[in-house]
Amino acid sequence: MAQRRPAGKKIPFQKDSFLQQFEKLAQSRKHHVLLESARGGRYSIAGLDPIATVKGKDGITTIKHGDEMLFKEGDPLRAFHSWFKTLETETNHEFPDFQGGAIGFLSYDYARYIENFKMLSLDDLETPDIYFLVFDDIAVYDHQEESLWLITHVNGSDQETADVKLSELEQMWLTELPAVTSREMKPETAGSFAAPFTEDGFSQAVEKIKQYIASGDVFQVNLSIRQSQSLSVHPYQIYKTLREVNPSPYMAYLETPDFQIICGSPELLVSKKGKLLETRPIAGTRSRGKTNEEDEALANELIHNEKERAEHVMLVDLERNDLGRVSRYGSVRVNEFMAIEKYSHVMHIVSNVQGELQDGYDAVDIIHAVFPGGTITGAPKVRTMEIIEELEPTRRGLYTGSIGWFGYNHDLQFNIVIRTIYATGGQAFMQSGAGVVIDSVPKHEYKESFKKAFAMQRALELSEEETKIR
């Protein structure tokens, strides 16, 4: 059988038209996904018609590919990847980085397949351990050139089939469609935020962590709080609002019949392009100032704060060590150190770490080396994960997992799931946390956790207000 290859064409397209057409096309599809960099990135990716869906939970992975249903046991990512490798292609260097492949997520709880620790917390949401949609046909918007790449896959030199498929994709994206029908939830389901982790419970957990730190178990632990609220608007409306309220580098909207994901993450877990590996840890947070002067003063205080600097350096070292597991010896380097990045409601300290992939390692090895990100667990990573399992009342599910893609061309990119809403059963769930160290004050860490959720809460509130006005 001839080897598969990507085929593509580029057409002029306006950014607003891309988002409007995606929303119109998505209305009639049960599964669809949009990956965007609403802050400085070059490409946005739309997937509308997956050739396969992949779900892994509790050691069983289900792959639905056309009329075929496969069931595999064991590590769900390895099970999926063993099947996915049969679809792989070589890179076409004229095309965008993502040229087709799998888009989806790894939940935080996927870490249980990498590190062996006890399952103590409640799995109340039953979020899949992994979930992916596999796309042969994709649309990639190039913000730099204001053009739309349409990409499909064919066998070998079959240009005739490629031309037909690309013509169909072009017609789909250029055809004038009716305006989007409002997809509202029942108004009576709207409600206020509820958090099962009370301030007293959180404070007790912080004190317990400080005991672990004092006894030498760990240096720092990220402790989080989950909130929930009944939904009164469709999740995609919330996503549209979030991208305006808090544009971020690693945004995502994923819709399935069972759940929807609204992600505004600022943080990269890992990317691979050719042999180049990158991770971009974030550690250190302050609120934005109300004036330029206050903003600069807060940024200056953050970057010179000894506690924040020490925590950041520790986590950069952790990420260097993780990346070093799969990198050529001597290739790991920090090419950007302790920069300030500002978002709508908060600012962060950010660094960038690079390495060169060692021969013999594949995509699963890369994920196993770095997942979950150390900035959202703590250090040392495995012991902090055991403590999180002991102290947080429910499983994290999607929170602090990763959303992203595995390309047919062996490349990959995954974020860290923060600033994210997981919608299911008419409820919106969001989670945020704070890094606890030896001198942490419980009430301050409690407030910081809620501060990080403000952009998500604001997006929900504005979406509801807009629906009422209509």
UniProtKB/Swiss-Prot annotation:
EC number(s) recorded for this UniProt protein: 2.6.1.85
Pathway assigned to this chain's UniProt record: Cofactor biosynthesis; tetrahydrofolate biosynthesis; 4-aminobenzoate from chorismate: step 1/2
Phenotype upon changing A283K: Absence of covalent intermediate
Record keywords: Folate biosynthesis, Magnesium, Transferase
Disruption phenotype: Requires p-aminobenzoic acid but not tryptophan for growth.
Annotated protein name in UniProt: Aminodeoxychorismate synthase component 1
GO biological process, one term: tetrahydrofolate biosynthetic process
Its biological purpose: Part of a heterodimeric complex that catalyzes the two-step biosynthesis of 4-amino-4-deoxychorismate (ADC), a precursor of p-aminobenzoate (PABA) and tetrahydrofolate. In the first step, a glutamine amidotransferase (PabA) generates ammonia as a substrate that, along with chorismate, is used in the second step, catalyzed by aminodeoxychorismate synthase (PabB) to produce ADC.
Catalysed reaction equations from the record: chorismate + L-glutamine = 4-amino-4-deoxychorismate + L-glutamate
Subunit structure: Monomer. Heterodimer consisting of two non-identical subunits: a glutamine amidotransferase subunit (PabA) and a aminodeoxychorismate synthase subunit (PabB).
Highest taxon of the lineage: Bacteria
Similarity section: Belongs to the anthranilate synthase component I family.
Cofactor dependency: Mg(2+)
Miscellaneous field: The catalytically active amino acid residue K274 of E.coli enzyme is missing and corresponds to A283 in B.subtilis. It is postulated that the enzymatic mechanism for the PABA biosynthesis in B.subtilis proceeds without covalent intermediate. First, ammonia is added at C2 of chorismate with concomitant loss of the C4 hydroxy group, yielding 2-amino-2-deoxyisochorismate (ADIC). The second step is the addition of a second molecule ammonia to C4 of ADIC with concomitant loss of the C2 amino group, yielding ADC. Both steps are catalyzed by ADCS.
Entry-linked PANTHER family: AMINOBENZOATE/ANTHRANILATE SYNTHASE, AMINODEOXYCHORISMATE SYNTHASE COMPONENT 1
GO molecular-function terms, A-Z: 4-amino-4-deoxychorismate synthase activity; magnesium ion binding
